């Protein structure tokens, strides 16, 4: 599995309160394919009809993901927090900047440094 982490990753309040070192370790463990319970990853969908996917980090241990590229744009401690906190902030930021919610363009621009947080 190839994983990239977007610049200025969106984090839930829980992750924002953790030491940066611990957050970096969690991200490294996801990249290395280690089991990470209680972590939900928000990533860019590779489906042309979808924008984002919210999945538990342990899903990436399945063989299906070994050949996929995952671009992580956010982390949360639960699905509800991913939707009610992180996704709401993403939507607000994207809409303020572009007047729409085209997350694929928004995060591509963030990855390229064309958009700051």
Would you name each region that the model predicts?
Residues 70-114:
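Short, compact, well-ordered microdomains
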Residues 9, 13, 39, 63-64, ...:
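Intrinsically disordered, low-complexity N-terminal regions enriched in serine/proline/glycine
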Residues 6-10, 55, 73, 102:
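N-terminal functional modules and adjacent low-complexity/disordered segments of proteins
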Residues 16, 21-23, 49-50, 55-57, ...:
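Mixed-charge, polar/low-complexity N-terminal
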Residues 33-70:
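Short aromatic-glycine-(Arg/Gly/Cys) micro-motifs in beta-strand/loop hairpins
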Residues 15, 114-117:
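Long, low-complexity intrinsically disordered regions enriched in Ser/Thr, Asp/Glu, Pro/Gly
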Residues 1-30:
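Negatively charged, low-complexity tracts enriched in Asp/Glu with abundant Ser/Thr
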